[in-house]
Amino acid sequence: MNRKYIPFGLALLFCLTPFVSSPIALVIGFLLASFGLVPTELPIASFTKKLLSYSIIGLGFGINFEQALSVTSDGIGLIIATIVGTLVIGSLIAKVIKLETTTAYLISSGTAICGGSAIAAVAPAIRAKDEQIGLALATVFVLNSLALFIFPVIGHALNLDQHTFGTWAAIAIHDTSSVVGAASAYGEEALTTATTLKLARALWIIPVALISAVIFSRGNKENGSKKLVIPYFIFWYCAAIAFSDFFPQLEVVYHGIFTIAKQALVVCLFLIGCSISISKLKSSGPKPLLFGVTLWVLISTTSLSWLVLR
């Protein structure tokens, strides 16, 4: 038996436990790949693609549709503006710094909607490679970690009220977990506002993934490929949201499915990390992180300015 199976198998089992978060799983996979401990004969790429789709569908059971639609009109308007603005500005910045299109689009999608979940949903629609997904996720996770500590400090320094901070956190912080962490540190009202707006923001995974499939299929046609990749799992994601909304009495079951889906996503990130190595990171250079930071700072400062000066 290939000796690589032992450390790989142990790491995989460890990622199945609740003690491992998504960023840690990505790092574990990255370390295994960097030390040459990933069995090359395993169909990791194809398995990861399928598991990602199932994970996203499962996450749909954790979306409260009515609560997501109960946000204020001002919040919805700002969310729409920042999502569209982020994708457009991201495209322009990518051209300026000459960053590879797919990686840039994944980072933009994660920044625009809800971090890692958005990247995982959009990736199959645009035929992103594991290496590109990994770079985008790593960039988003780094910025998430910074936001968790920086945002409350900025909020107190500017004396932001609870509602304003909650709205800002929901718009400018990528992942829901970091939004909840930063908002809860600021106050209960901020937490309620941030959570509700973030749920509404998460619903945009659906149209963005579908539109992305069309946009990138046109680009593929120019390169000789005529196939449109339709992310069918998005329709099942919608079905999961609708089903849980129509039958709320099964909330315990939905919570269980959502928990399993989140853990499956952790495993996905471990497998994606297995496709990244130090040599691949060196070849990509600092551009992905530079792109992510620039886009994040622009969206954060613009949305904060609008909230404070309106």
Swiss-Prot record:
Disulfide bonds listed in the record: none
Keywords: Cell membrane, Membrane, Transmembrane, Transmembrane helix
Cell location: Cell membrane
Membrane topology: Multi-pass membrane protein
GO CC entries: plasma membrane
Membrane spanning residue stretches: 7-29, 44-63, 75-94, 104-126, 133-155, 165-187, 199-218, 228-250, 257-279, 289-308
Pfam families attached to this UniProt entry: Cons_hypoth698
Top-level lineage group: Bacteria
Location (main, coarse): membrane
Secretion signal, residue range per the UniProt entry: none
Record-stated family: Belongs to the UPF0324 family.
Protein name (Swiss-Prot/TrEMBL): UPF0324 membrane protein VP0936
Taxonomic path: Bacteria, Pseudomonadati, Pseudomonadota, Gammaproteobacteria, Vibrionales
